Amino acid sequence: MNTTTSAAGRSLKVLVAEDNIINQRLVISMLTTLGHTGVVVGDGEKALKCLAKLKFDAVLMDVMMPTLDGLGALSAIRAQEQTTGAHLPVIMATAHGEPGDAAKYKRAGADGYVAKPIEIDQLNAELKRVLGIK
């Protein structure tokens, strides 16, 4: 496991939309280990409010959350981008992974996908890929 090399060679700011506190802590720990900063919200509605106030390099979005699920939040993010013209990379995450999920979420507008439990190398690789970092 290569946990000392960050995805960008610089610190990223990642919005983590995840309702499970254990998963929140694990992802924040991984991001910190990679040299990044994470901001946690517990549902899609809070994610949209946070995105309206703060700038992020990427979003890690749980699929199944209360209030507004990850796909609903993703749809709202992509609709907002039509107005702003700015693209925000979104990586979807789910514990109920099935074959074809990555393609399904890509069709819904996601840039990337990780299956839970998330591994640090998997997260790092997907951040690099969606941000176009070699």
Roles of regions detected by a PLM:
Residues K55-L60:
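Active-site beta3 strand of CheY-like receiver
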Residues V40-K49, G70-G72:
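Helix N-cap/capping motif at the beta->alpha junctions
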Residues M65, G97:
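Receiver (REC) domain active-site loop signature in two-component systems and cognate sites
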Residues E18:
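Conserved acidic carboxylate
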Residues R25-T33:
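Charged docking surfaces used in two-component/phosphorelay signaling
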